[in-house]
Amino acid sequence: MKIIVPATSANIGPGFDSVGVAVTKYLQIEVCEERDEWLIEHQIGKWIPHDERNLLLKIALQIVPDLQPRRLKMTSDVPLARGLGSSSSVIVAGIELANQLGQLNLSDHEKLQLATKIEGHPDNVAPAIYGNLVIASSVEGQVSAIVADFPECDFLAYIPNYELRTRDSRSVLPKKLSYKEAVAASSIANVAVAALLAGDMVTAGQAIEGDLFHERYRQDLVREFAMIKQVTKENGAYATYLSGAGPTVMVLASHDKMPTIKAELEKQPFKGKLHDLRVDTQGVRVEAK
């Protein structure tokens, strides 16, 4: 069997730690024959373990410690430490591996509870499990999630050629906001979510770019962000935002305007790459060989 988990783009502006969307890049785990010891074959990076030290197996064995070892093949086009949920995809894959080999019959909500407990927040793991747009919360162990279709629009990801670790990106955030700032930030997030659910991308885009929770503190960590935002705004994008903790920059635009936006960005002296993406509507799934 093969376990497939989509990449995710979290926060979407003001939906900090609570809003995310699944997109069309994938982690794939092919489950092969039984062995005496676990073996993960991959070419993702020399520093990524091939045995039980791999995060995939740490998660699976944490849930079902006595799983029969197997040979696994891991492939992924989800870039590491780029703000597209690479670690979350592995967490969800590990849960699904335990679910399948341990015959647990977990519901999606049970998978979400496990994943959120491990990850600490649901914004990436929720869309990786459900697909589509997910608005979720985790408060004192209580996890809630609402799944919805993302409005019709094109996604364009600018993926830099450098990493930005989440812990480094979080280190620039303030320890607290004033009550007045929190109310303003919350109201913007409310409008962003409501507009997305209503299919109003113009209003959603304005609210996404109006975030007060994190982007203003993080934007200087991604040197291309300001120029990309300027170019995309001049060419009619709905919104441009930092995907997750960055450094990937996500552009949302109508289908007719995205080709011009992409062409203009290709003229810029950036060293990263542009990727056309779509919304993944399935989330984690298992295919028979």
Curated annotation (Swiss-Prot):
Q: Which HAMAP family match?
A: Homoser_kinase (MF_00384)
UniProt function note = Catalyzes the ATP-dependent phosphorylation of L-homoserine to L-homoserine phosphate.
> Could you tell me what this protein is called?
Homoserine kinase
Q: Which organism is it from?
A: Streptococcus pneumoniae serotype 4 (strain ATCC BAA-334 / TIGR4)
Mind listing the GO molecular function terms for this protein?
ATP binding; homoserine kinase activity
Q: Which InterPro entries match?
A: GHMP_kinase_C_dom, GHMP_kinase_C_sf, GHMP_kinase_N_dom, GHMP_knse_ATP-bd_CS, Homoserine_kinase, Ribosomal_Su5_D2-typ_SF, Ribsml_uS5_D2-typ_fold_subgr
Similarity remark: Belongs to the GHMP kinase family. Homoserine kinase subfamily.
Gene this protein is translated from: thrB
Q: Name one GO cellular component term.
A: cytoplasm
